[in-house]
Amino acid sequence: MRSDPRVAQIVSDSGAYSDKEPLLLASGKIGIYYSNTELTLRDGNAYKKHENDSLAMLNYALEREFAEPTFAEIIDALTERVKPLLSDRYEEVAIAGGQTRDWLFSGPVAARLAIPHISLYKDGKIELIYGPGEAELEPRLRKSYAVHIGDLITSGSSTYSPLENPSTGWVPMLRAAGVTVDNSFTVVSRLQGGEENLAQGNVQSNSLVFIDEDFLRKHSKNPERAVAYKKDPDAWSEQYLRENGALAFIANFDPNGKNLVRARRFLEHHSHILKDAGRMKGLEAAVLEQFGKPLDEIVVVGGK
């Protein structure tokens, strides 16, 4: 797996890759660098005003292609790589993307290829976008084929998660609607198990940029730390938790916040380490003090 060197440089120059203090990823694992692929739009996150309207988001992304040439370069590269993946065994083919940031990349690719875009919403709604001004709710999608396009893959859980029963994610959502999907293409891969996870769901994962040791040595501001983490994220994370505890992640346990699934997954992965290191009681006390509720009332490990 080799990164597209031009897209890798755009990702770095735009701040779409950045070194961070330890934080929680959507998978519940700990990360020390972050990939905000949407920053390649260079729009100051203005896209967020369209985050609940896929048609508006797709039209906005098309506008950004003309306003930001380097963003258009990414769409060029995606389109070139995705086009051969479209199966000629189906009468209807489409590009699919999930709410919200997938749409920034999946929409323009669908427009370039002059094929429909399947917009997947977190609440289960599906729209079929035929062009810049037409959206169909609850479309008939049976016997069609789609390639999923995303902004980023880490563990791949938003695309396909076998941990839930039944499995969840954009791919099961498409398949439940009658769409055949066996390819997913993202701008950036963190190479943290997402490809292997999607393979369990019979989905081939592809990316333009891979956050591997070569990328980190070239683009990280702290390459020694980044490469050490990259070589064994779990070992690095365990050492961090034993030495520092989990207080840096306390905001994720806000009972009124948006990261409770992330917090639950964190505990599922790491609570045994915190207990063994004598750090769990410190987290429980901090959560109770800050949010006024016991940790086990806010986050039920093993729950939905």
Protein language model annotation of sequence segments:
Residues M1-K304:
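PRPP-associated nucleotide enzymes
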